[in-house]
């Protein structure tokens, strides 16, 4: 009996061993544990090698500053401290100021710049802070070194608070704070033509004087044909300097255009002086422009821009060949083309600067920046023409308007209600987020 039972058990075991494996057994894999694959000896070997590499490194201390950082600060300082070393008068309403580095306040050398750029001057008048841009009339070469200098020219403007304050108060020895050079009115060979027709009006001649100096000393390589508009001969700025530069370089030619009906206009071939009567029109540009491609650079008062742009539009030039220096600050919204009108003559603006909230009132005919400044609120700004981006702010509520000729915002800024207060007018009460003063 027991023998049969033993045979039966052996038969069952044999039957089980001969059965095919199930799907589960076929698909199963042995799990991999990476921790178990590590060997302690390998870790200690790596640690030893790593320590050896550390010990073989330089014993010199990590420098607190690298040369590239020092160079960046020299080229693009947050501020520059200067003092007035010379004042030159051009009649009762215009002066040229020579600015030298003020070593006593930490500026030993001035930042380098390109002809066509400007600096912003920071001024406090009766406790209110203002910033105004002025084109550099000196050459980049004149700014180099310990004896380097900048030159700016300030002309009185009608109802101009800052310009009149400067002309009445600035004198030799006065200490000033200015920005690093900024702006994009410089000559770029890859974009601009080999010949530039410069159109200047009044004190808008200053960047062209810097260009002419750079051409004469070989730092710029293009031909400058300058059409310089003034009322009469007495209002021409830097005439002697341009006469000298024309003789120094054949690439510089100056034509004076006088608008005064009584002005005597003729070509003096002996001295090289050329005068035209009237205004800078398309036909006048064609008269002096070369047959080859040329660029037009403009710098002058807003009235000149408004007139010249219409004339230039008839010339059929590519857009890249027409360059404008900053349009300049605007002072009256209702005087601008396309102004839609406002809800009231006075607006209330609630301003958030970081965690501070202030509410002020102002004249709706002023730009938003002007309203804030008159209420003692300092907003970072440089160009005051909607170009530099320093005053970039967010409109949280309310309606605003920007003149088309001064609207340089990106599409994203328009979509998400960002503005430049320096060239924007309030059409209703507003809530704004503005950047803090630097």
Question: Regions from the language model: what does each represent?
Answer:
Residues 2-94:
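Short, low-complexity N-terminal leaders and the immediately following helix N-cap/first helix
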């Amino acid at each position: 009996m027991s023998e049969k039972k033993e045979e039966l058990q052996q038969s069952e075991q044999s039957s089980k061993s001969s059965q095919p494996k199930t799907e589960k057994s076929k698909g199963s894999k042995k799990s991999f544990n990476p921790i178990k694959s590590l060997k302690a000896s390998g870790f200690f070997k790596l640690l030893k090698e790593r320590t050896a590499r550390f010990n073989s490194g330089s014993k010199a201390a990590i420098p607190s500053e690298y040369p590239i950082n020092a160079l960046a600060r020299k080229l693009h300082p947050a501020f520059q401290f200067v003092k007035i070393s010379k004042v030159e008068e051009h009649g009762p309403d215009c002066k040229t100021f020579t600015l030298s580095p003020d070593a006593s306040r930490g500026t030993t050398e001035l930042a380098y710049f390109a002809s066509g750029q400007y600096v912003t001057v920071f001024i406090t008048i009766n406790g209110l802070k203002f910033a105004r841009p002025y084109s550099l009339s000196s050459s980049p070469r004149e700014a180099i070194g310990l004896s380097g200098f900048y030159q700016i020219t300030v002309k009185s403007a009608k109802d101009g608070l800052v310009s009149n304050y400067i002309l009445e108060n600035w004198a030799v020895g006065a200490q000033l704070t200015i920005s690093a050079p900024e702006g994009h009115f410089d000559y770029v060979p890859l974009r601009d033509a080999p010949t530039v027709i410069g159109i200047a009006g009044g004190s808008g001649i200053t960047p062209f004087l810097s260009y002419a100096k750079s051409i004469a000393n070989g730092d710029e390589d293009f031909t400058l044909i300058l059409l310089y508009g003034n009322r009469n001969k007495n209002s021409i700025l830097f005439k002697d300097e341009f006469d000298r530069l024309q003789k120094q370089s054949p690439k510089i030619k100056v034509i004076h255009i006088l608008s005064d009906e009584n002005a005597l206009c003729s070509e003096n071939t002996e001295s090289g002086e050329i005068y035209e009567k009237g205004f800078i029109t398309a036909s006048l540009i064609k008269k002096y422009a070369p047959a080859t491609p040329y660029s037009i650079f403009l710098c002058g008062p807003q009235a000149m821009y408004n007139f010249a742009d219409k004339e230039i539009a008839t010339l059929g030039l590519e857009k890249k060949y027409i360059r404008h220096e900053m349009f300049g600050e605007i002072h009256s919204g209702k005087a601008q083309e396309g102004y839609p009108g406002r809800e009231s003559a006075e607006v209330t603006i609630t301003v958030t600067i970081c965690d501070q909230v202030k509410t002020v009132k102002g004249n709706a005919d002023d730009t938003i920046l002007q309203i804030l400044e008159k209420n003692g609120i300092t907003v970072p700004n440089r160009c005051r023409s909607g170009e530099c981006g320093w005053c970039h702010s967010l409109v949280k509520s309310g309606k605003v308007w920007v003149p088309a000729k001064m609207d340089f915002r990106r599409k994203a800024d328009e979509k998400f209600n960002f503005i430049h207060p320096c060239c924007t007018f309030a059409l209703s009460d507003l809530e704004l987020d503005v950047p803090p003063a630097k």
